[in-house]
Each structure stands twice: as C-alpha cells, then as structure tokens.
Amino acid sequence: MIKKAFCMQVYPDQHAEYQRRHEKLWPEMRQMLKEHGAIKYQIFLNPETSTLFGYLEIEDEARWEQIALTPINQKWWNYMEDIMETNPDCSPMTAELKKVFEL
C-alpha cells in the first residue's frame, strides 16, 4: 500500500460549497477512484488558511496516475474549477507532501 499526502487551496468563500460537492460525490466518480486503486481517500480543511489536506492510500502509483485520463475525472475537474485553485487543464493545483514521521 502506498500512502500519499498533498495540499490544495479552496477559495475562502467556497468552503461550504466544496464540502457540499464532496458530500454528493457522483457514484461514477466514487467507482472510478476505487477501480484505480484508491483504498482510502480523505480530505481535510484548515478554514483559517483555506488549505485542503488530502490523504490517500493506493495500491499502485501507475494505475492511480491513469485517473487523470478518465472522462469522469475530467468532468469533475471542470465542475470544481470555479471553487478552487486549478491548473490550465482544470486539475487542482497540488503540492505533494513528504512523510516525515509514522508511528
């Protein structure tokens, strides 16, 4: 199992909307994540900085990277573009985090 952590930024006035959209995650998006090896996927929000912290457990890095090519993921990125910082391809701007401790 591979553990990954990363940060993203949601716009300060969009915290509730970000949470609402994830509470209503499309079933086909949920299925696609699992099919691409997501074992556990959690996102936390620091409301003071609007920083999102993502934690992910996956089975295989190469398989996971293929999600960017799926039509449902492209649709999700477009859906989320108006409420968070994104790249020109609408993917969320992310900063990978380095694990420095585990108990």
Swiss-Prot record:
Pathway entry: Carbohydrate metabolism; L-rhamnose metabolism
Q: Name one GO biological process term.
A: rhamnose catabolic process
Q: What does this protein do?
A: Involved in the anomeric conversion of L-rhamnose.
Listed under catalytic activity are: alpha-L-rhamnose = beta-L-rhamnose
Entry protein name: L-rhamnose mutarotase
Which residues are catalytic?
A: H22 (proton donor)
One Pfam annotation reads: rhaM
Subcellular location, in the record's words? Answer: Cytoplasm
Q: Where does substrate bind?
A: Y18, Y41, W76, W77
Q: How does it assemble?
A: Homodimer.
Q: Which gene encodes it?
A: rhaM
Name the PANTHER family on file: L-RHAMNOSE MUTAROTASE
Which Gene3D superfamilies does the record cross-reference, listed alphabetically?
3.30.70.100
Q: Which family does it belong to?
A: Belongs to the rhamnose mutarotase family.
Bridged cysteine pairs (disulfide) = none
UniProt keywords (A-Z) are: Carbohydrate metabolism, Cytoplasm, Isomerase, Rhamnose metabolism
The molecular function terms in GO held by this entry are: L-rhamnose mutarotase activity
The record's GO CC annotations read: cytoplasm
Q: Which SUPFAM superfamilies match?
A: Dimeric alpha+beta barrel
EC number(s)? Answer: 5.1.3.32
